[in-house]
């Protein structure tokens, strides 16, 4: 599957305007040809395209092709009409034309108007060798909960082992002063009763200093903590904090053109507003659940919001999102591709996108 990586645009006026100034490994998918509504001339303008194989130039000595190679290029060259636009009646024409890296393409406009082409640079998904970054598509909520649960269990086990070790060390400290007291008691049998009475008191004071909190009390407190489990004071506090940070139930709204958005997760970063460049992750589906396009790894899909670089449903549905936010956008056919049929999308299709806003520039 091909993935869009950048917006393509070209203004054509006159003859033999190259599709790209330099060779590129990416294909070009043309989706629209249009003219400015402010064109003064009312004459129609026809867009022609000339296609021929690209000949790699490996050496400066090869820059001038010999006559035989030139004849071969002319024989294999194809030229055809893409569309005809006329100010006042026809301002734009949807296209579905892919230019591969192996083709050398030139556009010509036979008329007074300037024709503007737009589309996307594409790369094959299997050709992407970039490792997945931190900005790759997030885990689903259930997977995140599972990771947090496992982490929490490991921390609890470490805490339990730490407290058990602490209790063992205190038991050893308890036994040491007890033995010392017994030895001292044997040595002081013949001393006066006053000295015998003072000796235990001194030993008890020393024992309390060494012990700090009695071991029994610590063990009881630790047992109570285990018995309390998730209903203990600390757990209640954590639960309250988690519930306060947890997102509320998804909010669904209907926007311009019948576009329906559901905020699955509210972001906390910069807001997406018209004129700003946004970087997105997305999965595009038909109403039957069939995936026709996606961008879940590698370089995020980027475009300028509100400039018409994407279908109108995206300009409407993405507006207002914040960095880190996730949203489900349901786009009716008139706000998508209408009665136009493109690969993977039948005409008059309602499209469903699950999107995440990665960054706002």
UniProtKB/Swiss-Prot annotation:
A GO molecular function held by the record: RNA binding
An example Gene Ontology biological process: CENP-A containing chromatin assembly
Compartments (UniProt record) = Nucleus; Nucleus, Nucleolus
From the UniProt entry, list the residue stretches annotated as the region Disordered: 122-256
Task: Name the chemical reaction catalysed here.
Answer: [protein]-peptidylproline (omega=180) = [protein]-peptidylproline (omega=0)
Q: Where is the composition biased (Basic and acidic residues)?
A: 208-227
Q: Which residue positions does Phosphoserine occur at?
A: 192, 249
Q: Which InterPro entries match?
A: NPL, PPIase_dom_sf, PPIase_FKBP_dom, PPIase_Fpr3/Fpr4-like
Spans of biased composition, class Acidic residues? 123-174
The Phosphothreonine modification is found at: 213
Report the function annotation for this chain.
Answer: PPIase that acts as a histone chaperone. Histone proline isomerase that increases the rate of cis-trans isomerization at prolines on the histone H3 N-terminal tail. Proline isomerization influences H3 methylation thereby regulating gene expression.
The entry assigns this protein to a family as follows:
Belongs to the FKBP-type PPIase family. FKBP3/4 subfamily.
Name-wise, this protein is FK506-binding protein 39 kDa
Organism per entry? Schizosaccharomyces pombe (strain 972 / ATCC 24843) (Fission yeast)
């Amino acid at each position: 599957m091909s993935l869009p990586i950048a917006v393509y645009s070209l203004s054509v006026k006159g003859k033999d305007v190259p599709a790209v100034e330099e060779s590129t490994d990416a294909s070009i998918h043309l989706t629209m040809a249009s003219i400015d509504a402010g064109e003064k001339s009312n004459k129609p303008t026809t867009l022609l395209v000339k296609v021929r194989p690209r000949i790699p130039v490996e050496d400066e000595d090869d820059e001038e092709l010999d006559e035989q190679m030139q004849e071969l290029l002319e024989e294999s060259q194809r030229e055809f009409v893409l569309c005809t636009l006329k100010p006042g009646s026809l301002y734009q024409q949807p296209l579905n034309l892919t230019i591969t890296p192996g083709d050398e393409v030139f556009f010509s406009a036979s008329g007074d108007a300037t024709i503007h082409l737009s589309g996307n640079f594409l790369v094959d998904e299997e050709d992407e060798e970039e490792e997945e970054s931190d900005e790759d598509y997030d885990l689903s909520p259930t997977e995140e909960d599972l990771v947090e649960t496992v982490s929490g269990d490991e921390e609890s086990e470490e805490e339990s082992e730490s407290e058990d070790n602490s209790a063992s060390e205190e038991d050893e400290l308890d036994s040491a002063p007890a033995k010392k007291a017994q030895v001292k008691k044997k040595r002081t049998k013949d001393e006066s009763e006053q000295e015998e009475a003072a000796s235990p008191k001194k030993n008890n004071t020393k024992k309390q200093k060494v012990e700090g909190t009695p071991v029994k009390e610590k063990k009881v407190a630790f047992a109570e903590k285990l018995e309390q489990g998730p209903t203990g004071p600390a757990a209640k506090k954590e639960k309250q904090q988690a519930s306060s940070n947890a997102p509320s139930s998804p909010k669904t709204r209907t926007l311009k053109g019948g576009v329906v958005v559901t905020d699955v997760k509210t972001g906390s970063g910069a807001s997406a507003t018209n004129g700003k460049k946004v970087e997105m992750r997305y999965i595009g589906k038909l109403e039957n659940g069939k995936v026709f396009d996606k961008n879940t790894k590698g370089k995020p899909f980027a475009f300028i919001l509100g400039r018409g670089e994407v279908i109108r449903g995206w300009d409407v549905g993405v507006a207002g999102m914040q960095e880190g936010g996730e949203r489900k956008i349901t786009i009716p056919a008139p706000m998508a591709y209408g009665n136009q049929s493109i690969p993977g999308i039948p005409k008059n299709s309602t499209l469903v996108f699950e999107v995440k806003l990665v960054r706002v520039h």
